[in-house]
């Protein structure tokens, strides 16, 4: 039987996930969005012809029968929908960041655990083919101990009106660079402390632009490893870039992105290189994993607890930056 799905948020991300859901064999039964035009566009782009429309989330939750909910809302629009659905036993896929503060995130984790639901957070980079290969090497012990992580996120865009306002999106670290902070955790380990800086250097004359457009952090991990992650919104217009490098005792891996990387093995007399290149759709992979876990009753590889831990990481970066770079402990 096809997994029945409801989608909350009919924007670009919601429509993209909708198409991948249908490609994976799920049945979309309902879509909820405050915009009638967005709901209509969502329905027009789906193959399913009997998708119910809702303006009110509570009404959709009350009237529709579905197993899984996709929450594809901007950070500011998330207002307890996760907890309401969890208490009804709905399995939930939620985009990052899961919340704008860790206290809310902690409540979400608690509610999910108390109600035994399956969750998945949209950190799609974990599903990249090059990332998967490195993770396998880590788990086999072939990389040796982790040493250092470098990450760089760059773009130059005003995106959408809500994105440029820090009270609505949390800032670039929260809304975009969090992908690299999550990747750092995934490949290196859990951070102990961080020192962060951030500023707005390129958009001082842009109306309502209150998010940082440049940031940098240095982190220390429980296993002794370190990380340096930078982000900015001042580089090349039309190009979004998230590159990173992971250094281990026996291998160094340079990632152009999550699907493309060069592995240099240093545990031999002459270093050897191996290139991994793939055009696989990491978004599709995370959607399929979520559906499979619902069908099999198993937890996903990136559940709400993982989303909370990465939220704690970026919150500590911002807290440090707001205190002029004072070393700040990362919550557990």
Predicted segments, located by residue:
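Predominantly a Rossmann-like dinucleotide-binding segment in NAD(P)-dependent oxidoreductases
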Residues: 125-208, 324
